[in-house]
């Protein structure tokens, strides 16, 4: 169905396999049920553990990761029809651009498909590395520990055969969790990347106006229709971005708060862990957080910049040679582009690289305080 749109094809295929999109079968209830049960055992463990600071930080990271994973699955199911409508919008807009048979647009479509496919595979690769880190962590410990701290009331999970059974269970659900968490992130980033393509297509169309309708040799009616079509396309991009915001903005806010705290804690964990193997595993955890956040913030920032660039492209239409009504239309278009639509964080502020830098600065500040207090 989406084989031609490699930007989102792999992500939808995985989510569809687990029946989180389009299909509805037993796999949906198996993956969500097992993950929810696992979160319950993690919460029980965190409430009763006597582990040291290192263990608490590591297991807090796991707990937040699993909660975020199940939250994404529930959001997909709760807003299932709205996600499908958004994907349908992307599909229709994609083929509309493809059918233009414009060499520039075809080139950027090919490029975004390649980048999207590479990103989806890269994120899954990072996920597999992290899963290996989860599984190898108990092997690097001097005592019996599980990949994820968890406890079933009434059982001693460190006694045989419960330990072996619980270890196998956790290693089996880890790839399942990756397939719930990572494709969702890659899908949302893919939707944002296509928004960038649409902005570039609009800029290209506006720059063609001066070439197709030169001053002194233009049909006023055709020019008016072209400008109106560009304005409508700009509005469709804004509506597309609003649709993404409605589905994701609060989740992005939760992730920012959770991962900021976890990133600070994991950095602190780097200076208190003992052993090279544990150090490598903690670095893998940090890399996964940064890889997920940076991809989102990078493309969300680029989408905002490309929306802003629409104003420059509109100015290059030689609008000052148009009739007065068309000049007003172009001016309104430029004014709207100078207040660029953006992917929002909690419907409060746009997601930009500046925000990502602030996140790192704040995290490092708290890390420095912890280091001075406990170092």
From Swiss-Prot:
GO terms for molecular function: ionotropic olfactory receptor activity; odorant binding; olfactory receptor activity. GO terms for cellular component: dendrite membrane; membrane; plasma membrane. It is a multi-pass membrane protein. Residues 50-60, 143-176, 273-278, 364-375 are extracellular. The keyword rRNA processing does not apply. It is found in: Cell membrane. Residues 1-28, 78-121, 198-251, 300-342 are cytoplasmic. InterPro entries: 7tm6_olfct_rcpt (IPR004117). Pfam families: 7tm_6 (PF02949). Keywords: Cell membrane, Membrane, Olfaction, Receptor, Sensory transduction, Transducer, Transmembrane, Transmembrane helix. The chain crosses the membrane at residues 29-49, 61-77, 122-142, 177-197, 252-272, 279-299, 343-363. Expressed in olfactory sensory neurons in the antenna. GO terms for biological process: detection of chemical stimulus involved in sensory perception of smell; sensory perception of smell; signal transduction. Belongs to the insect chemoreceptor superfamily. Heteromeric odorant receptor channel (TC 1.A.69) family. Or30a subfamily. Odorant receptor which mediates acceptance or avoidance behavior, depending on its substrates. The odorant receptor repertoire encodes a large collection of odor stimuli that vary widely in identity, intensity, and duration. May form a complex with Orco to form odorant-sensing units, providing sensitive and prolonged odorant signaling and calcium permeability. The atypical heteromeric and topological design of the odorant receptors appears to be an insect-specific solution for odor recognition, making the OR/Orco complex an attractive target for the development of highly selective insect repellents to disrupt olfactory-mediated host-seeking behaviors of insect disease vectors. Odor-evoked OR currents are independent of known G-protein-coupled second messenger pathways. Interacts with Orco. Complexes exist early in the endomembrane system in olfactory sensory neurons (OSNs), coupling these complexes to the conserved ciliary trafficking pathway. This is Odorant receptor 49b. It comes from Drosophila melanogaster (Fruit fly).
